[in-house]
Amino acid sequence: MILIEHILGNVKKDPVWQAKLKNATVDLLVLDQREAQKSRCRKSTLQGLDLGISLDRHVVLADGDVLTWDEESNVAVVVQIHLRDVMVIDLSELKNRSADELIKTCFELGHALGNQHWKAVTKNNEVYVPLTVATTMMDSVMRTHGFQHLPFRFVKGAEILPLLTNSEARLLFGGAEDTDTHVHVASPLDEPHGSGLHIHSIHSHGDGHSHDHDHSHGDHDSDHKH
């Protein structure tokens, strides 16, 4: 096992490393978004090199980090991180609204996102929400709850990561894939038993059993499968 205690540089951000590795053989250490938030882990590269990551607690790996470099053999190990896409909601236009309307919209948006159990980070007049369901479903949630006046778009997680602090990155990406899917899209104008889009959660209780919840509005019916 090769112990990694320091990051040598980043090939995505540093022109010096870009030049060094231009004609080099690059072995990738592929991490998902949860693994990338850990300062300590053990994993093999695509070429089978056994690495033990032991970084300072405040240091997390980023896409493009160079972990090893052998100038003689012209071989480097570089981190590749697979991050989820992110929905970016632009709140800038709310600055032109009255204070009452701004407060009301922000409260309702927070309630809508929280009701879906979606993680979010607010920064630079924007809200970042990692995708845990299809973009069409997230689009439906925004429009059905009346937020179509707020510009929103879907971008790669790698575009957002450089804008975040380590703690914000952990909140946004750490374990987002384990968030229980819990999507309810139903217009306030619908009848109590009207049709709507209902995507329900599958919960695991750590005992080897899981069940899904099927909720209906009005009368509350639950269908449990063990």
Curated annotation (Swiss-Prot):
Residue ranges for the region (Disordered) are 192-226
Q: Does the keyword Transcription regulation apply?
A: no
Mind telling me which SMART domains this protein's record contains?
UreE_N
Pfam families per UniProt: UreE_N
Keywords noted in UniProt = Chaperone, Cytoplasm, Nickel, Nickel insertion
- GO function terms (MF aspect): nickel cation binding; unfolded protein binding
Q: What is its main location?
A: cytoplasm
Q: Name one GO biological process term.
A: protein folding
Q: Where are the transmembrane segments?
A: none
Record keywords: Chaperone included? yes
- What family does this belong to? Belongs to the UreE family.
- The entry's protein name is Urease accessory protein UreE
> Where does this protein come from, organism-wise?
Yersinia intermedia
UniProt lists the gene as ureE
